[in-house]
Design a protein with these regions (language model features):
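Basic, helix-initiating cap at the start of DNA-binding domains
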Residues: 1-46, 63, 68, 72
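Secondary-structure edge/capping motif, primarily at the C-terminal ends of alpha-helices
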Residues: 101, 141, 165-173
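C-terminal peripheral helix-coil segments that are non-catalytic and often amphipathic
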Residues: 2, 136, 171-212
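Hydrophobic alpha-helical bundle segments that form small-molecule/ligand-binding pockets
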Residues: 129-155, 172, 176
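Hydrophobic alpha-helical connector segments
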Residues: 71-111
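Short hydrophobic/aromatic patch on the recognition helix
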Residues: 47-55
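A secondary-structure capping/hinge motif
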Residues: 59-61
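Short, well-structured alpha-helical segments
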Residues: 91, 135, 151-159, 163, ...
């Protein structure tokens, strides 16, 4: 008898989390480069081929929290109520997702990435991929399209804010505290809100009425 879809999905999620947790523990214990996929499979009690059903590469396991964050942010933006501000949703999301980053394992993963320039560059690239989910929400707030210059400018500035956090985090010996994160991002979002309102004011009056 086949399992209900909900049960199958929960089992898959538990397996994915077990693989990521085992890998992160090994990365901290042995180092990222010294840890192999068979090592991870053995620690997670799965076959090596099973790992590829969840993660295309070892890098994807290391950055699994970024993927999880991206999915959660996409969900938060897609489920927002009419009138909810996309920028405030993103700001709240950034602050609320820092607990994992400041856990003991999270801080050690931070150190691993910080010590490797290639991994730091990959972190920036993965952050930049969030443009795909942020741009539609910004476009909706502006009443424009995702390829509109104003939408692209606000989205790129928001991604720059994410990368500012990553760069400041890399410059510290330990992870940024929630207070430091708030102090960094609040000026970014003040700037973005002002820019967003200025772009709204430049829209033709008819379009403003249609999107109000």
């Amino acid at each position: 008898m086949s399992q209900p879809a909900g049960l199958r999905e929960r089992k898959k999620q538990r397996t994915r989390e077990a693989i990521a947790r085992a890998a992160h523990d090994l990365f901290v214990e042995r180092g990222y480069q010294a840890t192999t996929l068979p090592d991870i499979a053995d620690a997670a009690d799965v076959a090596t081929r099973t790992i590829f059903a969840y993660f295309p590469s070892k890098d994807d396991i290391l950055f699994s929290e970024i993927s999880t964050m991206k999915e959660a942010l996409e969900r938060a933006l897609s489920e927002r109520s009419h009138g909810d501000d996309a920028l405030e949703i993103v700001r709240t999301f950034i602050i609320s997702t820092q607990a994992e980053a400041t856990s003991p394992v999270g801080e050690r993963i931070h150190q691993l990435i910080k010590a490797d320039p290639a991994l730091r560059n990959q972190l920036r690239a993965r952050i930049t991929q969030m443009e795909d989910i942020i741009a539609p929400a910004i476009a909706a707030d502006l009443g424009t399209r995702v390829d509109d210059p104003g939408t692209q400018l606000v989205t790129a500035s928001l991604i720059a804010g994410f990368n500012l956090l990553a760069d400041r985090g890399a410059a510290k010996d330990d992870a940024l505290t929630p207070q430091e994160i708030t102090a960094l991002i609040d000026p970014v979002f003040t700037f973005l809100r002002a820019g967003l309102e200025a772009l709204k004011d430049r829209r033709p009056a008819r379009r403003r009425r249609a999107t109000a």
